[in-house]
Each structure stands twice: as structure tokens, then as C-alpha cells.
């Protein structure tokens, strides 16, 4: 089934070129279908790149999905024109009276700051709290996973000596869980972060299941038992060249950065990296949307009751 996005969203043509099925909002409004409503809070600097990565995965579902984008008003974007945000993004004030089947909160390049020092922390707290009564399932990615675990459960983050950067092997810990159904017993996924969560605290949280974990870099996927909060500490949505672009950026800026682990063929950064996690990404998002579809109420206003 197609994914419904704004008619003039620039990434639409790129998605069509990739074979992603897209339906324009004008046509979708004339169909007698209750699509899943997904809101994406995009905190990444390169908005269009992240839009494309997530829409590609959402568009692989057999379900019809309507997507809206959200940005923070308490933060001035440095890499995206305000006119672009005003045209294609909503503010929290514009969506706070609405209800959504799912909310995706992306990572953000602020992980080396204390949570309370992030300039939009107060606004994000309001969104976390609002999501309890207005969103069925919230998927938190990378820094957002750390922030959400901290807000909801008091799990702190810790600085690591060397950046967790590369493609790591993970083990599925709970067989046949709805989010990891169809995964191989071990699988690869990218990470790119300077911090880790308090791993030792996760087993003490009775509402939480750890679903996939790496011996090298810790938890990748966790979820509350009621499916309302999902946490992914890595970046399974990344393109094949995203880690490469981050590596080149930091190298050119003379920042301390090592070659991404297990990423380039032969560990040679002159060779083209391969995407070895694409299947996992598609399957994970398919599983998430499928469970949202099955469990969310038809009348979303029931979430607040």
C-alpha cells in the first residue's frame, strides 16, 4: 500500500525513483480508508536525508500510512531553511490536539550535552508527556531512545572513551517477539554515538524487555511490554554511505575519529561500503507498523481515556 505525504515534499521524487509507492494527500482524502497516522519528530540536521530514510521504510508496509513531520520551535535549525520547515513541518502547538497511531522521534547531534542543557529539552518533555495520551506507540531512535529512557524511567547515559561507530553484530534475546519476528538469531546494525545507556539498570525495569543486544556496544532494541514505547539505540534506517559521510565530515574537521568498525570492505576506507542491515531495517519497521495496526484503537481519541 502507498504512503501518503504532502504533494510538494521534495523527497517525493527520490522515493518514486526508488520504487516506493507514494500517494498524494489530495487523492488519499477521497479514499474511504482509515490510514495509519504517523508523526515524525525530525531532530536530525539533514532533514531531507532523514525523511527519505524513514519514508522508504514506512512505505514498504502493506498498510496505507499518512505521515506528518514535526519540528521544535525552541530550536533554530542551522541546516534547514525556516521556509522549508514552515511549509512541510508542523509545530507542537499545531498537533497537540491531534491523535496518532505512531510517533517516531529521531536521533540528534546533542548527545554530549546533559539532557537538561539541550535547548529544546523542555519542549521535548512536553511531547513525551503528550504522547502518553495522544499516541499509541512511540519509536525512539539513538539519542531520542536515551532521552526517552531517561525521561520515563530515569536511565542515565554515560560518556564512552571512544565513539561507538560502525556496524556491530547483535543477538536476538526474545524469540518470536512481535518486533523481532523473522530476524535471524544474529544480525548487523550500525551505531554512531559517543554515549551509552546504563545497561545495568534495564533489567530492574519490570515494564521493559530488551529484545536485541550486542556484546560490544550493548542494547540495540528494547520495548515496553504494552508496546507503547520502543527504543532503538542504533541507526538501522541509515543508508549504506551515511557512516562514511559522518567519518569524512569528522576527518575533514580534524576531529578525533577512527575508521568505522566492520564497515568498509577489508577495513579500507577507500572502498565502497555495503548495506548489510537493510533487510533488518525493513523487517523491523514492517513488524512495528503491523503491531500498531493490530493494537491501536480505530477511534484514536480513546487513547486519552
Pin down the residues of each PLM region.
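Helical hinge/lid and interdomain linker segments adjacent to catalytic or ligand-binding clefts
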Residues: 85, 89-92, 108, 115
Amino acid at each position: 500500500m502507498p504512503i501518503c505525504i504532502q504533494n510538494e515534499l521534495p523527497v517525493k521524487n527520490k522515493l518514486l525513483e526508488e520504487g516506493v509507492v507514494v500517494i498524494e494527500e489530495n487523492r488519499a482524502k477521497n479514499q474511504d480508508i482509515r490510514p495509519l497516522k504517523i508523526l515524525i519528530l525530525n531532530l536530525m540536521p539533514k532533514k531531507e536525508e532523514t525523511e527519505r530514510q524513514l519514508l522508504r521504510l514506512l512505505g514498504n508496509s502493506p498498510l496505507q500510512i499518512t505521515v506528518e513531520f514535526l519540528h521544535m520551535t525552541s530550536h533554530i535549525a542551522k541546516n534547514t531553511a525556516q521556509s522549508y520547515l514552515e511549509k512541510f513541518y508542523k509545530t507542537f502547538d499545531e498537533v497537540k490536539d491531534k491523535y496518532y497511531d505512531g510517533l517516531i522521534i529521531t536521533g540528534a547531534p546533542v548527545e554530549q550535552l546533559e539532557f537538561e542543557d539541550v535547548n529544546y529539552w523542555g519542549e521535548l518533555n512536553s511531547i513525551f508527556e503528550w504522547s502518553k495520551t495522544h499516541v499509541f506507540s512511540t519509536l525512539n531512535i539513538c539519542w531520542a531512545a536515551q532521552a526517552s529512557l531517561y525521561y520515563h524511567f530515569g536511565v542515565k547515559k554515560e560518556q564512552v572513551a571512544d565513539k561507538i561507530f560502525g556496524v556491530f553484530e547483535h543477538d536476538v534475546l526474545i524469540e518470536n517477539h512481535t518486533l523481532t519476528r523473522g530476524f535471524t538469531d544474529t544480525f548487523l546494525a550500525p551505531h554512531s554515538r559517543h554515549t551509552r545507556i546504563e545497561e545495568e539498570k534495564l533489567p530492574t525495569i519490570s515494564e521493559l524487555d530488551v529484545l536485541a543486544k550486542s556484546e560490544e556496544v550493548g542494547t540495540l532494541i528494547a520495548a515496553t511490554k504494552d508496546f507503547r514505547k520502543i527504543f532503538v539505540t542504533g541507526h538501522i534506517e541509515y543508508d549504506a554511505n551515511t557512516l562514511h559521510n559522518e567519518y569524512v565530515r569528522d576527518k575533514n574537521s580534524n576531529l578525533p575519529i577512527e575508521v568505522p568498525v566492520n564497515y568498509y570492505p577489508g577495513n579500507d576506507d577507500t572502498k565502497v561500503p555495503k548495506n548489510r542491515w537493510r533487510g533488518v531495517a525493513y523487517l523491523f519497521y514492517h513488524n512495528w507498523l503491523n503491531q500498531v495496526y493490530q493494537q491501536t484503537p480505530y477511534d484514536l481519541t480513546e487513547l486519552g481515556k
